[in-house]
Structures are given as structure tokens and as C-alpha cells.
């Protein structure tokens, strides 16, 4: 991550799932886009894509680079599509009609 790197050193009280997901998100670099399913699998929780999305929506101020995570079709988060698109574009990612263009999974 860039200067927006999350400060998640104090993870006391977090579940193992939350800590595992945070560790994956901490490794994402500027301009890197992944799917919810990829985050779940990399965190050791394959099949938990919805839980990753739920976590990101429940903890919006936790310092996660949530804007770098999209659906398998490249679709942006519905409740914050504009902000997510702006952040991704600022990192050089092409976003067209609410989707990350060129996402090949």
C-alpha cells in the first residue's frame, strides 16, 4: 500500500477472520485490484467472499484499502461506487460504467 497504508497494528479484539483479511489487504499495492473471493482465498477462507464484503462495509474507518476490492465481474461497491471509482482512477485503474475495465479473472 501507499501512504494510505492502514495502521492496524492493534488488532486486539479482532476475530481471526478479520485479522487474516486485514493481512491480505495490507499487502495490496497502489493500482492493484482484487476480488472479494481472491481476498477470502488468500486469507485462508475460500468461499467467504460475502463475508469479506460484509467486513469491509462494517468497518469503513478501519484503514482498509477497500476501494481495491471488487466483485468477480469487476463491479464496484454499490453504496460507494463514485468514491471507489475516483480512488481507483487516481491510482491509474480504468473504470467504465461502474466496473474495472480489463479485470481478467
PLM regions: where:
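Nucleic acid-binding interface residues in structured DNA/RNA-binding domains
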Residues: 2-105
